[in-house]
UniProtKB/Swiss-Prot annotation:
Subunit structure: Homotetramer.
Any GO CC annotation of this UniProt entry: cytoplasm
Native source organism of the sequence: Thioalkalivibrio sulfidiphilus (strain HL-EbGR7)
Cell compartment(s), UniProt: Cytoplasm
Designated name of the protein: Nucleoside diphosphate kinase
UniProt: ATP binding residues: 11, 59, 87, 93, 104, 114
Keyword Oxidoreductase: no
Length: 143
């Protein structure tokens, strides 16, 4: 098993529901450590840049509009197989398909407002973490 890092975003709908602490508890109980975190209100430019891979998809404008509709919490998580573990904790993209007890099953309303984002691969995790955090902003968790 490899120690990995992944990017996680608590989206505006979950921030508005005031479930940040509950989501963090799930990360930590699963063995993921928060090594960087920040609350921010994404600009349109930031949201478009982050989700540029989806630029030609029909949902792109709605996704960007949603992501700038309120503050988000962006964090880098670290742990054994962090990418896959985080995706398991989040649940399926569509909360209707998400397993009971996952973040999306418990806190998301729809596929459009689905509470959280997580990197889909180790390669993308590195790119996504670098989008939001400078290397010196990531704290080693050795204790």
């Amino acid at each position: 098993m490899a120690v990995e890092r992944t990017l996680s975003i608590i989206k505006p709908d979950a921030v508005a529901k005031n479930v940040i602490g509950e989501i963090y508890t799930r990360f930590e109980k699963a063995g993921l450590k928060i090594v960087a975190a920040r609350m921010m209100h994404l600009s349109r430019e930031q949201a478009e840049g982050f989700y540029a891979v989806h630029k030609e998809r029909p949902f792109f404008k709605d996704l960007v509009d949603f992501m700038i509709s309120g503050p988000v919490i962006v964090q880098a998580l670290e742990g054994e197989n962090a990418v896959a573990l985080h995706r398991d904790i989040m649940g399926a993209t569509n909360p209707k398909d998400a397993a009971p007890g996952t973040i999306r099953a418990d806190f998301a309303e729809s596929i459009d407002e689905n509470a959280v984002h997580g990197s889909d691969s180790l390669e993308n995790a590195g790119k996504e973490i670098a989008f939001f955090f400078k290397p010196e902003e990531i704290c080693a968790r050795t204790r």
